[in-house]
Regions:
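N-terminal leader segment of winged-helix/HTH proteins
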Residues: 1-37, 130-131, 147
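Residues within helix-turn-helix
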Residues: 58-59, 70, 77, 97
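N-terminal helix-turn-helix DNA-binding core of bacterial DNA-binding proteins
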Residues: 17-20, 24-68
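Short helix-coil-helix linker/hinge
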Residues: 37-42, 71, 102, 126-128
């Protein structure tokens, strides 16, 4: 779709504002749930990555979160000070830093199992609607990332 069309310029009619304000609302909905776990939203996303695949590099985590390593490093330091992860330098290449779950980090996964269900209830939407929305958003993100790579 390369055709240019005139779009409304009011705030409430902007796709970007709908996405931005929904993201803020979603993050706020997570806050009281994650407070019980002692995690912030970015820390929770990081832990989700580690629960999927332990012993990953800082660079890999940053890529999955669409952040740079400099942004992820302080987040990881806080998780380490909480006892959920440990940072280990690579044996073959000391520039690489691997992130590993501690026993506390593994145990935290059990406590976090209820988080998705609580958020699902907060949305008051059907599973089908939310799965379709997630798929549509992932497709939009991919299209935008492709666009950004060209420019």
């Amino acid at each position: 779709m390369t055709q240019r069309t005139a779009f409304p310029v009011t705030l409430d009619e902007q796709l970007c504002f709908a996405l931005y304000s929904t993201s803020l609302a979603m993050t706020k909905a997570y806050k009281p749930i994650l407070d019980r776990l002692g995690l912030t939203y970015p820390q929770y996303l990081t832990m989700l990555i580690l629960w999927e695949s332990d012993d990953v590099t800082v660079k890999d985590i940053a890529a999955r979160l669409n952040l740079d390593s400099a942004t992820v490093t302080p987040l990881l330091k806080r998780l380490e000070s909480q006892g959920f992860i440990e940072r280990v330098r690579g044996t073959e290449d000391e520039r690489l830093v691997f992130i590993r779950l501690t026993r506390s980090g593994v145990a935290l996964k059990r406590s976090a199992r209820e988080v998705p269900g609580e958020i699902f209830c907060a949305t008051q939407q059907t599973p089908e609607f939310l799965m379709r929305l997630r798929s549509d958003l992932q497709q939009l993100r991919g299209t935008l990332n492709d666009y950004l790579e060209r420019y």
